[in-house]
Design a protein with these regions (language model features):
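ATP-dependent helicase/translocase motor core
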Residues: 1-167
Length: 167
């Protein structure tokens, strides 16, 4: 990083470092190689609504999008969720994506929020780091997201609970 960077460039440098720590190969949209590493984070990937800051690929399939914001936007990060959702729903160039991308992030490089769009009522939550490509790959093999599976937990059978536990 140099002193002459604007806040957006500094945020992207921080995001690049966080992605690399999580096992992502960070690439420019001008030089994409989907065979490098377990997952690729492609900067400025073209969509039909404009370039997304980052599109995440696992096994050569687009699985997520990251909307980068300058650090000063940290307290308003949730206000940018509709923009991220727009990129996730957009048609990607060079990729035949029929459904919206399931994994959405907004990040300043300091604060990162994550939404699993497969949840019954998707909402973002703050995370400490980006998920690893292997984690997203595993989640995609599951029939439903964790929050969706939690909705199908059987009710507690009170006949098997001791009386003193019910007080």
């Amino acid at each position: 990083m140099t002193e002459n960077q604007n806040p957006e460039q500094k945020a992207r440098d921080n995001i690049d470092a966080l992605l690399m720590q999580a096992g992502w190969a960070v690439q420019s949209a001008k030089k994409i190689d989907l065979n490098v590493g377990a997952g690729q984070a492609v900067r400025e990937y073209q969509t039909d609504v404009g370039p997304a800051d980052y599109v995440l690929f696992v096994d050569k399939k687009a699985v997520g999008v990251i909307e980068a914001k300058r650090e000063e936007e940290g307290q308003r990060l949730t206000a940018h969720e509709p923009q991220t959702e727009g990129y996730a729903a957009a048609r990607l160039k060079w990729v035949n994506n029929k459904a919206p991308l399931p994994f959405l992030y907004e990040s300043t490089g300091i604060i990162t929020r994550f939404t699993d769009a497969r949840d019954p009522k998707p909402r973002s939550r703050e995370v400490f780091c980006f998920h690893r490509p292997e984690t997203l790959k595993e989640w995609l093999t599951q029939s439903a997201s964790l929050r969706a599976r939690l909705q199908h937990i059987p009710p507690l059978n009170l006949n098997h609970v001791p009386d003193k536990e019910l007080r």
